[in-house]
Amino acid sequence: LDKDIHIEAYFYDNDEENPETIGEVPVFCLNKHTDIQALNLSLDYPVYLGTRGVFHERITEILKKIGFKIIKPVTVEMDLTLRNQYLEKYYTSIGREFIKLDKLKGLPSSTSANAGLINSSLTNINFGLTNEISASVYVVKSPFDRPLQQEYPLASYERQIYAGAVFAENSPDLLPENALRDDTGDNISAKNKQFCELTALYWLWKHAGEDIIGLAHYRRHFLLPQDWKERMLNNQINVILPTPLYVAPSVEENFKSRHDPSDWEFMMQYLKNNHPEDFQSANKFFKGNLYSPCNMFVMKREVLDALCTWLFPILFQVADHGGQKEDSYLNRYPGFISERLISLFFEINRSRFNLVYADKNFLP
């Protein structure tokens, strides 16, 4: 982002296997015995803490004992600012626009100063008046989720839905009375331990009737402007996705280094056999570094149907191949693969749907 800033080194303080370099920048282990002079580093260099906030205090203490004077925790606000600045620069470099919902005007397209950002010819659906359009962002929660540290009131457009509700059949006290749950009608609630919030997505696909449907998480909510629906409709937006996340060395390798690589390879082979027209695009996209995480979105009902019709057959086959994993985190691999697949779906359908991005929060 800033050519005047030069990164001298990366630090880590865990027991995992870490690379010796990232690009041409050296990677060093950080502890209270680290000899900075032997590493040819200066204690006057600023150190940015790019890890989770719960670790900042401990790492700051180590850095101070070593002798570093300028220690800058990367806050949520700083992370959002840097991420958006990087994405704007990156998209410009590849000849595309990085369009954020909060940058669009809540005015009719014909008078909006930003109307030129969107190619209205890409959609043939006219929603008409905003107040005639129904819209809900469903916030997914499990009956077994840990409570938030602080209560977070839902927005007027948000509705809570319980995923994996079938597992609370014998513990009715875990679900509020009249709770919206994913185990009625056509459902896959029993797959929740692997499919995570996707069991709620499947239920919404089969049962929700709103014109615009969103999916969020009880710890992760979209940061939407108050008039988000007006901005979406008046600028003829089809889809809102979370601001993309950068991962290294690639989207593919990021998944394979954390999960069973054979599940990824099976998924790619499935795409090659069943969606050959998309395979080359998938291969290229997954070699890149960006995807929208967390299985979050807001989209028109017709788009949701197109996405789910494409997505779930792939995930069912991947889950049949991979089976159950002993580790509960690793067992959620269909949910993690879905994050990458949703991003891929909208990449290969860029000419079909108008897409913008929005930031999200994380609640401890």
Regions picked out by a protein language model, each given a short descriptive name:
Residues 12, 48-50, 215, 242:
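Redox-cofactor binding/interface segments in oxidoreductases and associated redox assembly factors
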Residues 16-113:
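Phosphate-bearing ligand-interacting subdomains
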Residues 89-364:
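ER/Golgi luminal nucleotide-sugar-dependent glycosyltransferases, focusing on the catalytic module
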Residues 7-14:
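Short internal beta-strands
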